[in-house]
Curated annotation (Swiss-Prot):
Name listed for the protein in its UniProt record: GTPase Era
Upper lineage: Bacteria, Bacillati, Bacillota, Clostridia, Eubacteriales
Positions of the UniProt region annotated as G3: 58-61
Era-type G domain ranges (all copies): 3-170
Region (G1): 11-18
Residue positions binding GTP: 11-18, 58-62, 120-123
Known role: An essential GTPase that binds both GDP and GTP, with rapid nucleotide exchange. Plays a role in 16S rRNA processing and 30S ribosomal subunit biogenesis and possibly also in cell cycle regulation and energy metabolism.
Membrane topology: Peripheral membrane protein
SUPFAM superfamilies: P-loop containing nucleoside triphosphate hydrolases, Prokaryotic type KH domain (KH-domain type II)
Amino acid sequence: MFKSGFVTIVGRPNVGKSTLLNAIMKEKLSIVSCRPQTTRNNIQTILTEDNYQLVFVDTPGIHKPKHKLGEYMVKSASDAMKDVDLVLFLINPDEKPGRGDLFIIEQLKEVKVPVFLVLNKIDENPQEKVAETLKTYSELMEFEEIIPISALKGKNIDLLKELMFKYIPEGPQYYPEDMIIDQNERFIVAEIVREKALRLLSEEVPHGIAVEILQMKKNEKGTYHIEGNILCEKNSHKPIIIGKGGSKLKKISQYARQDIEAFLQSKVYIRLWVKVKEEWRDNQSLLKELGYKNMK
């Protein structure tokens, strides 16, 4: 008997959805940063085992939108809860249910599929706090399963997989067994660069950056030559991203190259520039060019 199902992970921004997905896959597939809203596009990730296939949709965190990109991110996360077989609602025990959580719960009450409550970061919180959080959320909604985990340390991830297998239906293998992600290489490369930029930049440049891959060529020796732009919204942000004598941009390039080489399994040369694109997050045509799907 072979089983297959689509699973979506939802939760407030920065709750650890991408870290959880990476723990399940044991691969660095989804951009992970300490900043909220770092996942901007639905990424379908495929886990194939001998007797089942799980297709995960890693969504942006649900938040109040402030621009067209924000509107897209919220719609993208909400749409992901439709037409799936299982929903994982990820929370942190050290945070009381806020307006965002209550908004998500109201949406979850409308779905017709099993919903798991997954408590992350249990290793960072006392048992009393975890128990208190469980009680609070259980009173707000009934969940098919409640699983405490540590996504960062991999605790109870195997248990979570076993429970997901239990709830998904019998079905075909939708993707080839060697396929782990449905985004193209350029998208992944751009996300890796953006992650490094977010990690290295100060709070002066929050989410107003994007990465545009201009060229990605592989020579006869198997080496990739990549060129790209880091886009920012303000002229004042450009020198911050570049750094003194180009030091910050150089670090972004170095750290990105290491992860890109691991992803592509090839040697990589990368050159990055910084360009100012004012209000790019409200530019629908540019958002489409940057890979944000279904923009209307």
